[in-house]
Amino acid sequence: MGARAFSHDSIFIPDGGAESEQTVQAMSQDNILGKVKTLQRQLGKNIKFGQRPSNAIPMKKAGSTDASSEEDFVLTSPMEIVTQQDIVPSDTENKSSDTPSSSSPLNLPEAGSDMEEKVAPVKPSRPKRHLSSAGTIESVNLDAIPLAIARLDNSAARHKLAVKPKNQRVSRKHRWLAQDRQNEPGSFESQSSLDQNGQLGEDKHIWHGEEPEPLESHEEKRLHEEYWRELEAKCKRQKAEAAEKRRQEEQRRQALERRLWEESLRQELLEEEEEGEEEEEVKEEGEEGEEVGLQPRAGKVPPEEGHQSGPEEQRCTEQELGGADDPARLEAEERRREQEEAERQAEKLRQREAERQEEEQKQREAERQEEEARQCEAERQAEKLRQREAERQEEEARQREAERQAEKLRQREAERQEEELRQREEAERQEKLRQRDAESQEEELRQREAERQRAQEEDAKGMLQEEEEEAKRIEELKGKETPEPLVEEGPQSPEGESQPWLTDDADQRSPLQRDLEKPGEREREDLESAGQREIAEEPRGEGEPAEQSGDLDAHCGGVDGEGKETAQTDSPQPQERQMEGTPAPEENEATAADIDRKVEELRWQEVDERQTMPRPYTFQVSSGSRQILFPKVNLSPVTPAKDASLAPAAQEPPAPRGAASHALPSALSIPHTAILVTGAQLCGPAVNLSQIKDTACKSLLGLSEEKRPMDVPTVESRAGSGKSRPAPESPSNAAALAEWASIRSRILKNSEGDQRGDREPARAGDEPVPRARCDSRGNVRRTPPVNAKFSIMPAWQKFSDSGAETFRQSLDGESGRKKPGLAPSEETAPQPHAAAQQEVSQEPPDTTDGCKFAKDLPSFLVPGLPSPQKAASRTESTTTLDSETTSDVGNPDPAMPGGEEKASPFGIKLRRTNYSLRFHCDQQAEQKKKKRHSSTGDSVGGATPATGSVSGESEPEATFLKHGPSLPQERKPALSPRKDSAESHSSGHYVAVAQSGLPPASGQTPAPEQDRAVSKMPSMQKPALAPKPASQTPPSSPLSKLSRPHLVELLARRAGKLDSEPSETAKESSDNQPPSPSLPEELKGQKRDEKDVPEKKPASPPLPAGQQERPSLIPETGRKEKPVLQSRHSLDGSKVTEKVETAQPLWITLALQKQKGFREQQATREERKQAREAKQAEKLSKETVSVSLQPGSSRASKTAPVHKPAAPSEEKKPETAVSRLQRREQLKKSNTLPTSVTVEISDSAPSAALVKDVTKRFSTPDAAPVSTEPAWLALAKRKAKAWSDCPQIIK
């Protein structure tokens, strides 16, 4: 309203009417083109504005506002909007000069053709509609305009009133037909004029209310009429032109409609859906058209009424205009409606088509995407399929490959199994062949033994007289040297043993046979031999080193002249046998004792057979508790050897020895496979005995006639071990023992290196070591064989017995004999001891050779040459009671395999390396064995003291040495000995009784076992002899030898006596019988003993001290070597002891505590044992006197040491008790030690220290343990450090 009312066209200043008109026209002409402009210019000169009917403006306002508002709400399609635009600009053409593009008529002619493209002008039109709809005077901003309004001229108002009706009609037509007339120039003139008039009308209306319209003059009316006429003429022309244009436009529209209808036909479906909407739109548009038509009609009336001056003219003009306009307008409206409808439909079609196309495009896009997705999915699926196929093929290929591999493996496995079967079959065939060979050899041996026995019987008859004489001498000697007879007995066996082995075995077996046949004769013979040994050993005790060397040399020579020695030994033994036969009372006693012993041996043999049934032993080789080197090592005892040996042993004592040796041949291998130093390998059968050609080896192994002597020599070697006593045996016996030692050492060496080439030199070199070893070994061997189920041996000794295969065979011969009974074990020990002692005196350095340290497993010592092994064992045993113990233990271990150890494999445990061999045996059997050994130790200990009352001190000392050196062995027995107050005695007794008891169990072997036990007893008595050796350490080794053979005889007799006398020995021997079943426990006991050995070894070292005094020459060298061994092999008792004690403070403390109790027990037990031993010692001393007389110089040398040891033996007895206590402590330690812990052998170092303490111990046996404890405690502490370092070292 404001925009129209106050547009420049409608404002006139009254003073300058024409000027204002011109100004207004000029302003409006900017937007007016063509004819309209010219018409306005022309009219502007003539038109005088006068008042128009006031109704015109309201009608106009109402029409324009209502129409615009209706159109705002009703118009929906683009065509309608365009129409609205065309209409509104026609009304507001002059007013909206600001928007020429929308209001300018120039744009309108193109609306028909470009209908679709003129949607944009809607926006300018709507603001105009808004203004028009809002048009009220109040809403107009009149701040600056009221002055102009006040100055408006009447002519302008009149002109407006005059022009308004037509203007309104034209504008209404234009509203209806704007689209039809868009391109018609005539319409623009009418529009512009109508707009002007309309605006003027509006303006006039405004001031019409303000002031009354003055009446126009006549002239003005005339001019006005002229103006209207001209205007009408112009309008007609314009209408004609517009009609023409409309026709043209209508044609175009029809063509467009045809096209649109054609499109609509194509989209009938869409049209049908939207017909309802279209019809509604058509109705709405019809209504709009009607309303629009009403508005022009309504607008007509007021102007007609408004004409006051010229109604007729106006009517004419209106009629003309109406006549001209109505048909055209109606046509135009009809065409417009049709066109609009067509356009709307075409637009809808286009929209629908566009939507359809867009939808189709979307669908196509979606389909394309879906197709792509499907393709991708298909590709993925195909890829997956390909992958799965490839995987399947690969899997099939893998399966095929796996099947091929499995097939290959199966084939290889089948081939391997076939190969194994073939190998097993071959091995079985070979084993059968070996067994047949062994059986044939055993048969030969049995025949030879029978011949020997017959010869021995003849000799015995001849010897009865000599024995009677010797019995007298023995009786005289008994009071002086009880241990000497023991030693002599041992020597006799060793003598016969070492001489021709056959002769020695014959001698020993003849004593055993005599025991079986003529116990009295045998006893006399044993007494004579013992007496001779004692006599020879006493001198030896003083000049032991030289005597030993001589003996060793003699033995070497004896080895060379084995037959000679055999003859010599045979002759002395027959004499002894005659002497034995002479003393009827003693012979009767011996016979009774032999009978009892045989009975018990049979029992023991049965027990041993049961226990030694080939029970495979499994043990672990472990480094510490964490690293297990070999989780399960199986040691399977050789049943044939054991059975053969046990069966023959059961048959007769002499035969048993032969049987034992035979059993070994039948076994063709060591009773138990030996663990090599590597620990990884298990030795198979040492050698086929049938393959042994060397007579010495055969004699050692009992493969030849000497095999029987071998068995006896084993005992005799023990007798030799106590060479001081073997002196009574006579040089022949000494030579035989030396020969034995050299042969054995050589065998060991040969098995290690030049088995036979080195024998002679080895003999010579090793014999000194053997003496030293024998001391320790004799001691160690004595005890451990009984208990040792599992013996810890120096590698050299172990291998000397079991490590060196040749020596092992010899040991096997021995241990074969020993297998029948524990005595064989001890036999093995004594022989090595005898040989070792001789070798020690002769060749201490060989000890070093004997112990070769395995580099791969430092815990195991590789056996050196046989002699070096013995020498090493000697040296180690002498130098280190520990190593001695180890060696002894080693021998006993093999011996035990022979006897009790049949059930128990022998292994080496070295504390330093922390490698342990765990032997798993029946706990019950072990416990039984332990009980036996403990009881046996007591009875044997008692017997030993009784026998060694004279040699009691030396015997306890020797026993201590035994316990020290043989602590490994004694550790086992010593365990019981510890329990037994007198440990050395208990160990000695234990060994002796166990052996004597076991000999009964083993029947024939029992005799050798008894001899061995006797030899062990002499070893215990050997301390008695050892006292001299204490001054001379080597003598103690002879003492151990003498005491062993002597103890063997003593135990043989004592076994009878113990069986007859105190049944305690029998009980103990029966206990020993259990020990064989309880070998595992014995081994445990032995381990304990061995563990205690460090403690006891200090005590035993005093004996070594005594021994060292004698063997000091050799033992010192041996000791020097022993320390090397200790450092090298950690076998040295000192280092081992250190390790044991230091490594295990707990067990050390426990061992110390146990030592106290054991010392007390030992004191009481030793008292009892000494009482028993005193009696036996008297008998043995008498026998020893006679025997020592017979043995000749060699026996004299042996006997001299024996006699000397007799006194020291008493001293040593207290020390033996001390040593027993110490040993027990060590055994306790060993007991406290973990079973898997490597058992230390710790005598050698303590022996050196003990040498210093020996005098103290001798003087104060009870105090000796105290002095010993510090030494071994220090060693133990050092060992503890070593132990702590062991795992790292091992790694």
Swiss-Prot record:
Expression by tissue: Expressed in the small intestine (at protein level).
PTM annotation (Phosphothreonine): residues: 482, 639, 1033
One BP term from GO: epithelial structure maintenance
Superkingdom in the source lineage: Eukaryota
Pfam families: DUF4592
Modification Phosphoserine, positions: 7, 28, 132, 493, 510, 636, 867, 1037, 1076
Annotated Basic and acidic residues bias: 201-221, 302-318, 326-461, 470-483, 506-527, 534-543, 594-612, 749-778, 969-983, 1056-1070, 1081-1098, 1117-1141, 1157-1182
Biased composition (Acidic residues): 270-291
Regions of compositional bias (Low complexity) in chain numbering: 580-593, 875-888
Disruption outcome: Knockout mice display adenoma development in the small intestine in an age-dependent manner. They also develop pulmonary lesions resembling early small cell lung cancer and solid-pseudopapillary neoplasm of the pancreas. Tumors from mutant animals show increased expression of Wnt/beta-catenin target genes without the alteration of other signaling pathways. Intestinal tumors exhibit disorganized and decreased levels of F-actin.
Region (Disordered): 48-71, 84-137, 159-221, 234-253, 267-663, 701-1238
Subunit structure: Directly interacts with actin-capping proteins CAPZA1, CAPZA2 and CAPZB; this interaction decreases the binding of capping proteins to actin.
Name of this protein: Capping protein-inhibiting regulator of actin dynamics
Gene name per UniProt: Cracd
